[in-house]
From Swiss-Prot:
CDD domains for the chain: STKc_MST1_2
Residues where ATP binds: L29, G30, R31, G32, S33, F34, G35, S36, V37, K52
Keywords: ATP-binding, Kinase, Manganese, Metal-binding, Nucleotide-binding, Repeat, Serine/threonine-protein kinase, Transferase
Domain of life: Eukaryota
Location of the region described as Domain III 1 in the Swiss-Prot/TrEMBL record: 641-668
Signal peptide (from-to): none
The protein, known as: Serine/threonine-protein kinase 4 homolog B
Catalytic residues in the record: D142 (proton acceptor)
E.C. number: 2.7.11.1
Annotated Gene3D superfamilies: 2.60.120.380, Transferase(Phosphotransferase) domain 1
Location of the region described as Domain III 3 in the Swiss-Prot/TrEMBL record: 836-972
Residue ranges, compositional bias (Low complexity): 358-396, 411-437, 459-473, 513-541
Function, in words: Probable serine/threonine-protein kinase.
């Protein structure tokens, strides 16, 4: 099974006894569920290989399957297998070494998405590998960027055959659900049978991940993804205008919902996407070089991957625009061929020529630099010492410093002009106008790198670089400045110095980056508590030709709840917010200035106001890319003031001043100043702007508090593996008019980052709200995400009653959360529900003898029974719910239901052992769902008996039984006491088939006898059941008192004779009794088997006589 193409001729000898003596393990490349992979050197030849160390355990069969598949594969597009050896309890698998790891690792390490040329290379190589596998009747079943490895030459190869499958001629389709959830094809999830077209679907999803950094539905819980893939339309690129039509068409073909409509790997290799975009393996060079630099700075691949994972977790739930890799320059060639292998051969010659040219250029440059240094040494004349001329010496020093600084600035400016600016990376244009993007820090100014909102993370220490030619920053110990001059030189040389990320833990990750410069605070010259206008002389001198008019200024404070911090936390909405009205196109400068005693990191958000005539005067409660004004740098600086200049179109906007950390109290001033710039023939004027604080009297009606999922209230979700979600905290929300409502669920620091959260909104009955928590009443729901908050906006929400149920996805995930509701309905109300008076809940389980099954089985009497008593003097509506708590070991839920029977007396204190159709009020269906319920009207002073049951005996499961009513404290529920029980088996055979009692025959005395003693008397029930058969014999029994020698004395009781499955007799006795039970057939000589069961209120003796 070999493929033409150049393969490595490296081979290992057979019979290596101790692989640890033959291979040197250099570094760990990664760790997985089956083992670890190391970079290693084969000592005898020096060849670099990859060694996978796998423990020999119960999962080792899967590894043997992977080895078997790798042994059979001989293709340059599949990672080569060299051999495997055993040492102690570990298997050493020797494989081809791919220097740059997986495509996924390269993306995570560099924090970059791939460009189209790179995606084309990966997809083409993957299709070549799949064509080889599919031609040999193999399915990979786990195609994803994490299983596509990149060699040092930029070649891409398929790896990880742990879940691959072999297709035989007899089974051309498989039915096993296996693989990574986000990449599974619809037919794999639906288990309708699939073939190698499932790999094509996974390749389409992989292409989207390489373009957008995440696969579709990445922010949803994996179980939710398994539902979305078969039922939703095929995924597409989020921003198709950024990509070529050929790329979009390639993805559409790969993601055809019907597997029969997906092209084969062979057909896709001919797609026009590769004709236009496939260049050569050299296109991976920029990405691999950047990855290698990061790996070296981190101290190894494993550390680099850990740092990338930590950065990725901090970005979870935050919208980020990831940097694209550099575009690929078209090679100069008139005879360029269009296939990968031929391109690589042609380019190898070009690369060698370029290396020789670079070496010559470097040699020439070194010679020129040496000559220049010699000339400078000859020209330099040291000044003669003159102790009497101090002024001249000082002036000379200043002149030399000015010259040095000027040269540094010119050099830095020239360097900056040759590298692409951050604005060229992002596709987000400034829709509101022109932005200068400069920040004032104190009385000086540093020119900001001005990222668009989607790229704001590039300034944080755990984020991606601001330019495609730079390497992501790796946290290191900062160099200590030798003097204040060093600080000044560093700031002058680095135009973005004012926006560098701080190295402290406070600045990592999140929506908002944080800067590091600390500037000296000037003495505040003004204090104001109202909107004022000051003279332009109090403003810092502008560094542009624009002339600033008098500012519109407001003063405010961050105090208590209003010190909400930046948007990295859920508390930012509590900061002061200001409405800015602009009536004509105007160039403005927004300045935020600290006036308190303590200097902290500050910044502000500038966003469009809410839509709608009424809502635009209210606070902004969502800060996403679509609402923020593009072009403004929102880096937080430890500075006296921060400012930005921008040209804005007429409209309403919101400014939100904030400190970086919450609970940092202090005062501030916010200035909005119009410049005198000429725009469209008209000059700016302060009359064009109006600034005012958004006050509570015109704001949203806000209800907010902190709550917990704890103990039984950590019940999980409706979509998860538990029905206990109904025990979560619940909130009743009532609106009296159609309203716009936004609900924000935020998780606090005691909840792990990986925990998914979300909430449901149910339409509710105000009088009996709990019964509304069913799928039929579900009004809306959110996705479950593992970010810091979930925001849901419901436009035009009809008046009525609703219940909000916040959830973690899985049960028993404890922690604190906040729930905040913003509504423009001024007459509404929201409060936490306490339904303890309306809901009676008992916990039970079917376990051992108490898992007796339904009424089809005589053992139903072993089930627990519950008495519900209506103490009201009027009819009462009750809803009875039976809930299964959770799935066990990922198995399907059993079929369960319950019976509702009339109680013979209101205060019954014993279980029912006999039921007739007239006794049963009703029953539910038996279904394998989390909940079944039954609703009835109970008459005054009556009681029901509830019998929860599994459909078949022997099923053990926990459950909740709930009784819900719209009247408080009128229903009582209690479990009926269990009686002592014994069960024996017997048969009528030979002489023991004596028939019934008769005065004319004594044969009945030969029937089987069972000793039944009641030392204290009391109530008892005897049940005789015959074996299952198409038609039943007539059966019955007698209970006699006996003398000490066993002689029958007198009847205690006797049953009738019926031709049915069982006969039941309930009776009682006021004194202790010693006796026997004699089961009988109606006619003699009828052979059969039977069971005899006794239930007794008190202790009993029951055994074969």
């Amino acid at each position: 099974m070999e493929e033409s193409g150049q393969l490595s001729d490296f081979k290992l000898p057979e019979g290596i006894k101790d692989p640890s003596l033959e291979f040197d393990l250099i570094e760990c490349l990664g760790r997985g569920s089956f083992g670890s992979v190391y970079k290693a050197t084969y000592k005898k030849t020096g060849n670099i290989v990859a060694v996978k160390l796998v423990p020999i355990n119960e999962d080792f069969q899967e590894i043997l399957k992977e080895i078997n598949i790798m042994k059979q594969c001989k293709s340059k597009y599949v990672v080569q297998y060299y051999g495997n050896y055993f040492k102690d309890e570990t298997c050493w698998i020797i494989m081809e070494y791919c220097a740059f790891g997986s495509v996924s690792d390269m993306m995570n390490i560099t924090n970059r998405v791939l460009n189209e040329e790179q995606i084309a290379l990966v997809c083409y190589s993957t299709l070549k590998g799949l064509y080889y596998l599919h031609r040999n009747s193999k399915i990979h079943r786990d195609i994803k960027p994490g299983n596509i490895l990149v060699s040092e030459e930029g070649e891409c190869k398929l790896a990880d055959f742990g879940v691959s499958g072999q297709l035989s001629e007899r089974t051309r389709k498989r039915n096993t659900v296996i693989g990574t959830p986000f990449f599974l094809a619809p037919e794999v999830i639906q288990e309708v049978g699939y073939d190698n077209k499932a790999d094509i679907w996974a390749l389409g999803i992989s292409a989207i991940e390489m373009a957008e950094f995440h696969p579709p539905y990445h922010d949803l819980h994996p179980m939710r993804v398994l539902f979305m893939i078969p039922t939703s339309t095929s995924p597409t690129l989020k921003e198709p205008h950024k990509w070529s039509p050929e790329f979009s068409d390639f993805i559409a073909l790969c993601l055809a919902k019907e597997q029969s409509q997906r092209p084969s790997a062979k057909d896709l290799l001919k797609h026009s996407f590769f004709e236009k975009k496939l260049k050569g393996s050299y296109v991976m060079k920029s990405l691999s070089e950047t990855a290698q630099m990061v790996i070296e700075r981190c101290g190894g691949r494993e550390e680099a991957v850990k740092a990338a994972a930590e950065r990725k977790s901090k970005q979870s739930g935050v919208s980020v625009d990831f940097i694209h890799c550099e575009s690929v320059d078209e090679p100069d060639s008139s005879d360029e061929e269009d296939l990968l292998e031929r391109n690589n051969k042609r380019l190898s010659t070009q690369i060698q020529q370029k290396k020789e040219q670079q070496a010559q250029q470097q040699q020439q440059q070194a010679q020129q630099q040496q000559q220049q240094q010699q000339q400078q040494q000859q020209q330099y004349q040291p000044p003669s010492p003159n102790n009497n001329n101090r002024t001249t010496t000082k002036n000379n020093d200043i002149n030399e410093l000015d010259s040095l600084l000027n040269n540094m600035m010119m050099s830095s400016s020239a360097s900056a002009s040759t590298s692409p600016s951050p604005s060229s990376i992002s596709s987000n244009g400034n829709k509101s106008g022109t932005t200068t993007n400069d920040y004032h820090t104190g009385n000086g100014r540093t020119s900001s790198s001005s990222p668009q909102f989607g790229l704001q993370h590039q300034n944080s220490s755990n984020s991606f670089p601001s330019s495609p030619n730079t390497v992501p920053s790796v946290e290191s110990k900062p160099r200590q400045p030798a003097s204040e001059l060093d600080d000044l030189l560093e700031e002058m040389m680095n135009p973005s110095f004012g926006n560098r990320a701080r190295n402290s833990s406070g600045g990592g990750g999140g929506l908002t980056p944080i800067g590091s410069p600390i500037t000296k605070r000037p003495t505040p010259t003004m204090q104001s508590s109202t909107t004022t206008t000051t003279s332009s002389s109090s403003l810092p001198l502008p560094m542009s030709p624009s002339v600033y008019l008098s500012p519109t200024r407001v003063s405010g404070i961050w105090s208590g709840e209003s010190a909400g911090g930046c948007a990295n936390t859920t508390l930012w909405r509590k900061n002061p917010q200001y409405l800015l009205q602009i009536t004509a196109t105007t160039t403005i400068r927004i300045t935020l200035r600290q006036t308190g005693d303590k200097l902290v990191h500050i910044g502000f958000y500038f966003a469009r106001s809410n839509t709608g005539a009424n809502d635009q005067f209210r606070r902004r409660i969502t800060l996403t890319k679509e609402y923020l004004v593009p072009g403004l740098d929102i880096t937080f600086l430890k500075s006296t003031e921060v400012s930005a200049k921008i040209t804005m179109e007429p409209g309403y906007y919101v400014i939100i001043p904030a400190t970086f950390e919450p609970n940092q109290e202090g005062s501030f001033e916010l200035d909005v100043t119009a410049t005198s710039d000429n725009i469209g023939g008209q000059y700016n004027s302060n009359n064009n702007i109006k600034l005012s604080e958004i006050k509570g009297d015109r704001d949203w009606r806000i209800i907010s508090d902190r709550f917990e999922w704890r103990g039984s209230s950590a019940g999980g979700s409706f979509s998860g593996s538990s029905a206990t979600w109904k025990d979560n905290p619940k909130f009743f929300f009532e609106t009296t008019q159609t309203s716009n409502t936004t609900i924000v669920l935020g998780k606090l620091s005691d909840i792990p980052k990986e925990t998914y959260i979300g909430f449901y909104i149910f339409k509710a009955d105000k009088n009996c709200p709990f019964i509304s928590l069913t799928a039929n009443n579900l009004y809306s729901k959110t996705s479950f995400v593992n970010g810091i908050e979930v925001v849901h906006t419901q436009q035009q929400m009809p008046p009525g009653c609703y219940i909000i149920v916040p959830c973690t996805y899985d049960s028993r995930q404890e922690g604190s959360f906040t729930l905040t509701c913003y509504s423009d309905c001024q007459q509404g109300s929201i409060y936490k529900l306490d339904l303890s008076e309306q809901i009676l809940t008992v916990h039970g389980e079917w376990r051992g003898a108490t898992s007796g099954g339904c009424l089809n089985h005589t053992t139903w009497r072993n089930n627990a029974q519950y008495l519900i008593h209506n103490t009201s003097s009027s009819p009462t509506k009750v809803t009875i719910m039976l809930e299964q708590l959770e799935k066990m070991d990922n198995q399907q839920l059993p079929f369960v239901g319950f019976y509702v029977a009339k109680s013979p007396t209101p205060n019954l204190d014993k279980k029912l052992f006999s039921l007739t159709p007239k006794d049963i009020v009703g029953n539910t269906e038996f279904i394998n769902d989390y909940q079944v319920h039954f609703t009835s009207i109970m008459e005054p002073n009556t009681s029901y008996i509830i019998i929860p049951s599994t459909f078949t005996p022997g099923i053990e499961y926990p459950f909740n039984l709930r009784v819900i009513t719209n009247q408080h404290n009128v229903i009582q529920i209690s479990r009926l006491p269990e009686w002592s029980t014994r069960k024996l088996s017997g048969e009528w055979r030979g002489q023991s088939c004596g028939g019934r009692y008769s005065n004319t025959s004594s044969s009945w005395t030969l029937n089987p006898r069972f000793r039944f003693n009641l030392p204290r008397g009391g109530r008892f029930t005897i049940i005789l059941a015959q074996a299952e058969k198409p038609s039943y014999n007539g059966i019955g029994f007698y209970y006699f008192k006996t003398l000490q020698d066993g002689t029958l004395r007198e009847f205690v009781c006797k049953s009738g004779f019926i031709c049915g499955k069982e006969i039941v007799l309930e009776s009682s006795i006021n004194e202790g009794v010693t006796g026997v039970v004699i089961p009988s057939t109606f006619e003699p000589n009828i052979q059969d088997s039977f069971n005899l069961t006794i239930y007794s209120e008190f202790d009993l003796d029951f055994y074969n006589n």
